[in-house]
């Protein structure tokens, strides 16, 4: 809302023929290593980029509003600068992938049965998983996502705790819309907070055991 209510931002959209702000989706991004000079050192900063939807269910990422970046000082809760690199034509075709918006793409695949008549080869007791002499405890936390604890083989300790600490995604392009992007997906967004719930009989086939994740 800080960006949408800024007159400079509204003027940049009007140059592109966009007047209905309800159809504009704004994505806040970490400011990266290049913070705009209008934001004081030590203040929390982000850069906001925008996308246009035809309606509330549209895939906004198909229509980026290229050239416009909003610099936001989160400490002061205000937009300090609107960067405008000029009007770039927006794709006209929609990119919705729901069944009602797409033609029939192919015949339905043949049914696949994955069975283990004698049951699975693993055992689960609480968060303890046992398989082929291996034992490991599993959990999920908001930052790292899946975490393995006390991994052992035939009673011999191998790892006390192992997890993915972070993942850095540098975009690696000179384009001003992307050159500053170097996202830390773990520490800035949280692997665990972005996990999806799985449904038995839908997401996986075979002898499946789902575990609860408490964060």
Regions found by a protein language model. Name each.
Residues 4-215:
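Beta-strand/loop-rich accessory regions of lumenal/periplasmic or secreted enzymes
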């Amino acid at each position: 809302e800080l960006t949408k209510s800024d007159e400079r931002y509204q003027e940049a959209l009007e140059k592109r023929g966009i007047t209905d702000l309800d159809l504009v989706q704004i994505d806040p991004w970490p400011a990266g290593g290049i913070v705009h000079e209008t934001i004081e050192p030590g203040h929390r900063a982000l850069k906001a980029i925008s996308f246009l939807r035809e309606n509330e269910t549209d895939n906004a990422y198909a229509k980026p509003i290229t050239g416009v970046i909003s610099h936001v000082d989160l400490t002061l809760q205000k937009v300090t600068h609107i960067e405008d690199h000029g009007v770039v034509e927006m794709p006209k075709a929609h990119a919705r992938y729901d069944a009602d918006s797409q033609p029939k793409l192919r015949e339905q695949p043949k049914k696949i049965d994955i069975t283990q008549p004698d049951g699975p080869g693993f055992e689960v007791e609480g968060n303890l998983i046992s398989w082929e002499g291996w034992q490991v405890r599993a959990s999920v936390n908001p930052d790292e996502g899946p975490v393995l604890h006390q991994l052992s083989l035939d009673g011999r300790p191998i790892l006390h705790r192992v997890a993915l600490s972070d993942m850095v995604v540098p975009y690696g392009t000179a384009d001003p819309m992307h050159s500053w992007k170097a996202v830390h997906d773990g520490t800035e967004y949280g692997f665990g907070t972005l996990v999806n719930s799985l449904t038995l009989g839908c997401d996986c086939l075979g002898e499946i055991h789902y575990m609860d994740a408490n964060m």
